[in-house]
Amino acid sequence: MLALLKITLLGKFSVMWGNEKVDGIQTRKVEELLCYLLLFRDHPQSRETLSKLLWEDQPPIKSKKNLRQTLSRLQDALHQVCPDVPALKLNIESDWIQIDSSIDSCLDVVAFEKSYHLVAGKQARELTDDDFVTMQNAIALYKGDLLEGWYQDWCAIERERFQTMYLALLDKLVQYCEVHQNYDLGLAYGTELLRRDRASERAHRQMMRLHYMAGDRTQALYQYERCKLALDEELGVEPSKRTIDLYQQIRSDTYQPPLFIAKPATDQSEIYSAFSDIVGRLEEFSEMLTKIELHVQEEMGALENAHGILKKA
């Protein structure tokens, strides 16, 4: 029976029973309470926390009353949705509330997060064909950002966490495609990654390499220009030395794709290069901060001089 239930939090919130959408959970506060309990199902949630969270603009007595009423509506709604599924029963005590953890098998966010953790620690050359399928399935689950259209603070924090995992999975899919010379698919995943993170210099480099190795040197060079524009508009910085070096190699047609199979699983040169990128960026930001500080000091000095002139006057 539980296998028939599917709860979607990635994208627009929905509850499905088999192939039919369940409309029994109607009011927004009931939905908010359910979704919060689902997202934070690993720990009991105190009534006080829930009442403050969902009715922060109301006095404690009123917010606690609202919680009791909403909780009652949620219980009724869950019972109407599928009365024979014990996983949808709430564990309710005088001070805390928790939804049964066996609900995990019904949640898209659980499957997505499990897939992410299966591959998170693996280098590109360690990713297997099974890992590739796992990542593709996880990406397919990501039908949109978490609870699209919701703007509560707790929701925004969780949304950003899932966005980060999604981008990391896309990055690994691009890496896998590069290693296995599946350039067209790698470019498709890279395009989606840049659609969501336009200023990802790493993704731009991946796209430059993929275009070049696919035999499209012109697009590889265009990709550098897109990277340069994105970094300038989004961050106000120039491409890093690593990106410029790649561009120059592609422009002179001297770029040599790495022999992925021959390399060890832990490529110290890549780690050093990535570290150099970070150091370079920190140096750029340090210079920017120094300029800003000098500008502020000049402005403060001008204000002090003006103040002194006014006092004398």
PLM region spans:
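Canonical positions in the second alpha-helix
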Residues: 192-193, 227
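TPR/TPR-like (Sel1-like) alpha-helical repeat modules
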Residues: 139, 212-236
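Intrinsically disordered, low-complexity protein-interaction/activation regions
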Residues: 1-188, 226, 254-313
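Hydrophobic positions within repeat-based interaction scaffolds
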Residues: 155, 228-259
